[in-house]
From Swiss-Prot:
This is Kelch domain-containing protein 7A. GO terms for cellular component: membrane. It comes from the Eukaryota. The modification Phosphoserine is found at residues 89, 361. The chain crosses the membrane at residues 23-40. Glycans are attached at residues 61, 256. Keywords: Glycoprotein, Kelch repeat, Membrane, Phosphoprotein, Repeat, Transmembrane, Transmembrane helix. Residues 340-354 have a biased composition (Low complexity). It is a single-pass membrane protein. Pfam families: Kelch_1.
Amino acid sequence: MLPTGEGAEGQDWHLDMQLPSKVVLSAAALLLVTAAYKLYKSRPAPVGQAGRNNKDHKAENETEALGQLAFQEAPPGTLPRGRRRRKASKGAGTSLDYSLVDPEDPCILDISRSEEATRKGSDESQGRQCPDSQQVPPPCGGQEAGTDVRGKPNPPHLPHSGCEPTSSSGRLIPGVGGSCVGDKLSPWPDSRPPEETGSGDLEAPNGWTDLTLVNGDMNQSWIFTHMTGVSRGEAGVLQAAADMGLATQQQEGATNASHTFSSVARIRMEENIIQKAEGPGLKGRVYDYFVESTSKADSRPVPCPAALADAPSPGPGPEPLVTGAASRDEAANTAGGGASEAASPQPVASPSAPGFSRKVSLLQIAENPELQLQPEGFRMPLPAHLDQRAQLSSACSHGEPHVQLVAGTNFFHIPLTPASALDVRLDLGNCYEMLTLAKRQGLETLKEAAYKVLSDNYLQVLRSPDIYGGLSGAERELILQRRFRGHKRLVVADMCPQDDSGRLCCYDNVQDAWHPLAQLPPEAMSRGCALCTLFNYLFVVSGCQEPGGQPSNRVFCYNPLTAIWSEVCPLNQARPHCRLVALEGHLYAIGGECLNTVERYDPRLDRWTFAPPLPNDTFALAHTATVCANEIFVTGGSLRYLLLRFSTQEQRWWAGPTGGSKDRTAEMVAVNGFLYRFDLNRSLGISVYRCSASTRLWYECATYRLPYPDAFQCAVVDDHIYCVGRRRMLCFLADHISPRFVSKELKGFPSARGTLLPAVLTLPVPDVPQTPV
């Protein structure tokens, strides 16, 4: 029955509208089938199917691209990357085989297509790879190892000169005993990373091989076995490196020796494919493992300094000191063309310090502080037998302590006995060791000699934490007091910057005579310099250097016990015409030309720092300063009507008026708790005013009638105040009851050419030998 009318017309319209829908539906179905087919082909097959479809793999798989890795020299810690190859089979159940192949690598691991063949090859390799313990290492003794995990041979961790790769490709090239020898070596005893040692598909072919020393050298070579039984379901990279160093200390002609063994192992494993990752992108992981160990073995003490020699065997097994592990996850974007490719993460820096080279392991141990052993571990105790003068004369006949380098530390091995103690020359390098031995063995003569060396070079000892920190409080006070054994003398420096010459002379009050002491260094010659003594050292602060009159901030030091000039830390500011005083083991440089600042010197740190400045922005020029009752007093010059006082406890200045006359103040000194101020008057001469540091009440105590008196500077020796001028020298007796000038005029400084600067030093007895260092 035919439709008629409006019903037939509506049905024709419905048939006409279904045709475009069918086309769209067919196209969508075709795209869906294509996408499902591609997804099915790119799906990684289970591990068990790899062995069953081995023949189909060989017949149907075609290589699209070879990922190759060129083992070139690269900085330590970097991981060269190569193109990754994905081999896919058209058949069902095929597995993906990701690999990195180096066509120029002489040591390439070819993984078999089935687990059974892999395990069989592992057994055969294990049977072949049982080398003797005395196996000779190859000429290119690489300590860097690269092995294949899940189908990838990894590059060496560190480049090594002299081990260039050769151009070859193919299967594993057998070396010694069927193992791969060269730069590509397996770093673990069981040829697998620590996190996979328990996996069922991995087997350990062999352990470490022994270290062999050839011709007594320290060069070593390592032979590692390759890995078998790699899982086919994942792709990864294992990178390993192992370094070792052996320092041997052995007495020549004897069996006693000391061994220092250090080793470093680094493992990096990359998991580039994680099948259970969520999202369209694939993830990768990097595991870094670092193990460092060091150990030592000391034999019986030997009487003479041990000589550095090579030994054929290392010390005992290493003790792990530092271990670390790090992991990292990264997301990789999918590549075009429908093939998913895992983005390889960049190498992570190893947490360890730089390792040491295998060629010069001993030198690298000396350069790496983390591999060095403390000196206490190598200190030899004193021999029990005393008849060793012959041994000392034979081994240490040169008279100097023998110095040798073991793991970067200097050791002094001196067989010291009561009979041979006087034959050893002491200096700063061995005096503390000898002092320790002398106290242990009860050698009083040696102990006194060591104390003398420490005392004569007190500043160097003070700046050495190893020496000064090992002394007790009583010993520190003892070596300081020993510096003041001798005669306290007046010392005057004749500064003549015009002639670039100067001298240091001392005054003998018994004979009323002057004696030359030392020559001033040309660098210390300046106009407006200042002198002061601290710890029986003479410090000179430079003023203005000639020619040109440029201000200088240099500071020099003279040791009267060793007759040696040295330069210490310079000032922060140049201070011509400043005043220099010593208080509580520090130096204070006060004022200077247009300066109101103060600097303090710490001899233990050898450093100048700023102290509280002068109050009220008062600058001090042509002034004088002294120390009394643990306080600093400043007056005179631009401070004509002021007396400034500084307290170290409160770290502040006080300003007060001065008492007495309005005359010019030439000098101010302190004796026995009293301040003595010397004022000059053109008609009356010299007036002396005294003030107690506690009451601060000034009064005139003595005068010296002298028309037109010359300027002078003062220095205190016991209770005598010496007023040193160019034409004459006066002596003032600072008696508590009756202070007065000595009637006898003393002999003046002979042939003064420049400015005379007095100071006080304790000079040693001429017959006592000194120890210049």
